Amino acid sequence: GASTLGGRKIWIDEDVLRLNTDGRGRYLGEFQGEDRILVVNKNIPYMRSDYMAHISDATCIVEMDEPLVSIPNLEPSPALEAISTFIADQTCDGACIQMGIGDLSTAVGFGLRNKNDLGIHSEMMGDSMMELVKRGNVTNTRKTYLPGVSSAAFLMGTKDLYEWADWNDQLYFLPSPICNNPLNIAKNDNVLSVNTALEIDLVGQVVADNIVGTQYSSIGGQLDFVQGAQLSKGGKSFIALTSTHTKNGQLYSNIVPRFQTGTFVTTPRSCVQYVVTEYGCVNLKLLTMRERVLALISLAHPSFREQLRDQAKEFGLLP
């Protein structure tokens, strides 16, 4: 059949199309608009999936040859290496892992290289997971939901990752509403969910995507995996962040007494389990408000701990 866009006719060979997800892990069937434009790009890897659409569902098909966005691996800082050690110490053989993007994921992936029979069920598949599969740390043999394959909603990383994923039967992709469903996540035992944050306040609220209304990333599946991991038998959820960041040459604490007005919470305090910085790892579940505050202050950079204690008293969080 053929489709036309702007007078250009594009021919295809099959009536049924096997589709990758879009940038948010969504499939064609989730869109209800009148116009559904499919893009064919030879640089996109073929990703194994059972989610297909009939050609009649598409308004038109466009061919293009755009290079994919490549995100380089960053060398983890000593702080991130310390964080990865704390997380690895809490990880058992056979754990089913979920990680995000960036240097935290690289560090955690390196820290898991002494673990065996790991599984993967993650919103995003990245380079650190690819390395664990290549090394044999990931076998997916202990997964009970989608066993035998590393499952995800989308890929993001380097060119090496895209080339490795192309026609790779070790991988399986599914729409994000299914991949990120906490009840599906919990079908695997010993889920290890590792997500990052920009800031966390003294009661355990997490901000991971925005500061004072400025959006730095999408919300993604953080809350889904935080909940799904804790519903999993033996599962653990980690919010990991370095204790500080530097802006314009000045050091700031990532553990704050309160968020600035206009900052929106990504994960509520009632859902947060483990919090990790380079100074330690604490489990906030079942802690009183005072215990939470003291536990989180212990994770802060030493230069800010006294100030945080004073602010906690000022706000009525400590006597």
Where are these regions (language model features)?
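Conserved alpha/beta enzyme-core scaffold
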Residues: G1-P319
